[in-house]
Amino acid sequence: MNKKFIFILLIVFICFLNISQSIRINNNKNNNINNNYNNNNNNNIQTKEKRERNLIKFKEIEKIRKFLGNVESLTTIPLVSNEKIILEKLYSDWNGKDWDDNTNWLNGDPCMNQWYGIECNSFDGGITNNVISIKMSLNNIVGEMSTEIKNLVHLQTLDISNNGFYGEIPIGIFQQMNNLSYISLNENEFQGDLEWASYLPDSIVTLWIAMNQFQGTIPTFFSKYPILDLLFLEENLLIGTIPPEVGDLKKIKLLDFGLNTITGTLPSSIGNLSYLEQFWLYDNQLEGSIPLTMGNLQNLKLFEVTRNQLGGDLSGVFLNNPNLKSLRFSGNSFYGDLDWICQLDGLRDVHFDINRFESLPNCLGKAPLQMNELLLADNLISGTIPSSIGNMIGIEYINLARNNLTGTIPSSFNNFSNLNRIDISSNKFNCSLSEILDPIKHQTHLTIISAQYNEIHGEFFENMVWDGVQQIELLTKIFIINLSHNKLSGPIPEYLSWMPNLNDLDLSYNNLSGTVPNQLSFLSTMYLENNPFLGSSDGSLPLFMEPSVIFIHKDTESYACPSIIGKGFDIRISLDSTYYNNSFCLCDYNYRGVNGSCKICPQDSYCPGGGNDILIPSGYYPMPSNENPEYLLKCIISNFGYTSCNPDSSYNYTCQDGYQGRLCSKCVDGYFHKGTECSVCPTGPQSIVIFIVVVVVFIALFLFFVMTDPKRSLPSSTRKTVMYYYQVFNLLLSKLSPWPSFFSIFYSGSSWLNFSFGFLCINNLSRWPNLFIVMICLPFAFLVISIVFIASMQLFHYVKSSLNGVDYIFNKKLIYSGVRVNLLALNFLYLPLCIYIFQNYPCTKDQVTGESFMSFFPWQECGDNSTHNRIMRLTIAFTIIYVIGIPLLFAILLFYNRKRLDNPMILTMIGSIYIDYRKSVYWYELVALGRRFFMAVSLALIDPKSSFSIFVVLLVIGSSIISQIIFKPYVYRISNYSETIGNSVLLFSYVCILILSSLATTKLYDSQGIEIILSVVVVVYTVLLLLLFLFSLKYFLPKKWQTVIDYHIIKFITWVRITSNNLISDIKDINSIDGDDSFETTKEPIFERTVSNNLNVLGSFELKRRNSQINSNCNNNNNNNNNNNNNNNNNNNNNNNNINNNIISAKQLDCNNNNNNYNGEKITPGDGQDCLISLSIDNSGTNFNHNNDNNNNDDNNDNNINNNEEFNKNN
């Protein structure tokens, strides 16, 4: 029963191996179709070789097992009791409950109840049995070799292979088993050396200990076992050389040392193994050549030394081995002639691939007719295939791949009766396809043709698959055809479908054309890529194909295409995307396009891939067009951080409403430029009203400055401070960003000070270059208007005098006033003129196209452009006329008239240039023009965001503050203070904008705090300027009103001073310290009180008022003086009546009193006087003094602590 059961298991196992082998061969065939000979293929080949070896070895082992199984097992006789105990102990030690099969174990008697894997027999005919066999291979046994097993002394067979045993095998454990002939420990994890094997009984026949972790060298003691015929040591960790004592294994039939690390050479003593049939030495590190004594092995059938380092010429080595069937020398360095194999009649397998052979065997006479496999791939074979190869009629598989063969396949290949597979890939066959297929097309068993990587050319013909003479189909068993990487041309014919068993077709990397026929839908694998002329004109796929959802990306492409699969069929298809015009392909991320035409997304843009979509981020402009952008240009950021370029960051790129042109920088119709922004033009009645208001304001200002005397005008110093501050502040607002949105109010309100009249939207006058032309014409317009007005006024007076009969007197004052007005206009226009002129110079070069465009008008091209050239000629001309001419004109006027500045005529004409400054710095207006010039250079001629521009701006504003502190140029103290504070505010604002710009770029910190501080500082200074402006308006009022205003101002200031003094006194008392503990301190001048030389009072202050008439004479007439004295007395009486809270109010005093503490010197007309009212405040009395400062010496005025300069002299 057990014998039959074991026999059936063996038959099933052999069938399983054969089936697995067949499947593996097919798999290897499929895998090798599209791959070069590489490491992966080597692994597959090694796996295949291993299975083949195991099958061969298993056949030899079966002979032993059948011999050992001839003894009948007496199941009716119980087992000796002590052996049952041993088996139970083994069950416990080896954790029997976890075995895959523990049938009947521990139930009754092992022999009678047939415990799984146990065989029994009686040797003495007694009433008890003994255990003679343990066969528990593949039973999931885990543990060490138990020493209990040594007591089973009657054991003949021990097979515990393919389990989980580990550890070392105890020495002597098998020594007492005198009948032990078969040991199989393979495929476990046993360790240690092989010393235990020296204590085996002499009865040992088979020792299979392969695929463990045994270490050390090959022992020499195996020769002491007289009947050992099978020795398996493969796949361990053995090292060293093959000892010569191996030659003493007289009965050995199979010797397997494969897959170790054995070195050295093959000992010649191997020739003594007369019974040796199989010798396995694969995958070691053996060197040298094959010893000639191998010819002594008359019974040798198989010899394998695959993948070693052996070499040499094999001629004459195996001529005396008549039974030799298989020679496996792959992966070595053998060379020489191969004709000697023709003498080996029984040779079936020749595996000589990966060596250094240079020619094929030429068996002209005798040939091995039983040859099945001839493998000579990866050698150095050249020339043509000899026709004598066809004499080996039994060949089933011929592999000549990866050599240097040329020519064609000889017609003698038709002699092969069982040809199954042919591989001539990676050679240099340069024949037609017909010359390759015709010699083999009648092979009825042929399944695989591999001819890739050659130079085969030509087309497919019908006679390749159809025999018209015999009217039969050819190549009906063909399963795989690989003709890739050749030069095939023409269409793929539909008659390839006449090969019914064709499964895999590889025609890739050829020059095929046309379309794929729908008749090939039955294939399982189809490789057709890299056929440049293969494709459909309409971009469609064959009916049996469709794109899958899996996209494949090539390293050299910027798009991914779907893999093509069978429509309703399981077909693996490799087809170029050009076949369907890339219509199913999608661009990669960061690329855009359709149908495989994908361009890289321009820098700073975003392309999601999969189509032509591109997202141009806000603030960038696509070039050369929105539809096909190749690169992006950074757009101008508006003054308040906005951008006109794609503000919504949408895929549909648009400029913001009101913008157009390059960089979205040009205003469309109905919009005007306000800095870098385009604002909507006022329309309807609103535009008319704005225009009328502007015209009326400018006419009123013109008439005011022409008709009024300079002493009656708004104090010039205040006007200049306001104009300079707001002109520069507006320039910063227009050229820098990002300003807080709050400042848009300041920008709109101050634009007109820089003559930005674009908001008028009069036709195209608000656009460049028209606005530039209007600007440079303004000074001439003022001149023409002045001339026309003065001429009209002179004509009016002439006609009036004529009608009244009075002689006409030419009024020179009007001409003087006209000159003064035009100089005033040039002064105020200088900064705007510089800005408009300098903006035309800078051009920015496009780094991609090389074209240049104006930096401040990016839509206008520089260079070869008629408009730009005309404007540049005007710009250069007016740079000389205005930018250089105005300061030069002012300098000439000042230095030419420097000794006549007190002259009434000079004062009337050019007084606006110097009247506001102290006499010692009468030239300071040139400094003011210089700082305007450099501000315009730094923000209009140079890129406002460049480091050089930053340096110039900081230098200009900083030097302005320093010069203001040093020179104190203005006559009025408050003007000096306001000018210094204004420059400080400009400096602070500029620094804040630099910080805000940096924060906007890095986005590391919040900018809200800086925005709030900046807004507060600018608003506070604006309020201060407004108060100063309102204060200066009192000079347009009657003198009585001015006196009342002065009184209230004096009263308020006095209250503030008294309050502050009391507070300071209290603080000093609180903060007083003991003198012994204090350090000596130095009183800082900045906190010292300024006291008038003429006053010795508790507190004092000064109030200057300019005389009302510039041409009035100070009368020396005593009567007039007396009258004036009387007036003064009356005024004093009135003052006494108005004294309140010990505060004395200054009433109107006539500065012409020569008898009232005056020196009585005659004052010539035009000597303008300032009446200095020095008020002494005493809480205990009502005393006061009136002192008139008539000193004309400017240096004395500078030394006066009250700084009562002769401001009137400049008037």
Curated annotation (Swiss-Prot):
UniProt-listed Pfam families: LRR_1
Annotated InterPro entries: Leu-rich_rpt, Leu-rich_rpt_typical-subtyp, LRR_dom_sf, Plant_receptor-like_S/T_kinase
Region annotation Disordered: where it falls in the sequence: 1109-1141, 1183-1211
SUPFAM superfamilies in the cross-refs: L domain-like
LRR repeats: 154-176, 179-201, 203-225, 227-249, 251-273, 275-297, 299-321, 323-345, 346-367, 370-392, 394-415, 418-440, 445-465, 477-499, 501-524
Keyword tRNA processing applies: no
Transmembrane segments: 2-22, 688-708, 728-750, 771-791, 818-838, 876-896, 920-942, 947-967, 980-1000, 1012-1032
Membrane topology: Multi-pass membrane protein
Compositionally biased tracts (Low complexity): 1110-1141, 1183-1205
Localisation: Membrane
GO molecular function: protein kinase activity
Name of the protein described by the UniProt record: Putative leucine-rich repeat-containing protein DDB_G0281931
Native organism: Dictyostelium discoideum (Social amoeba)
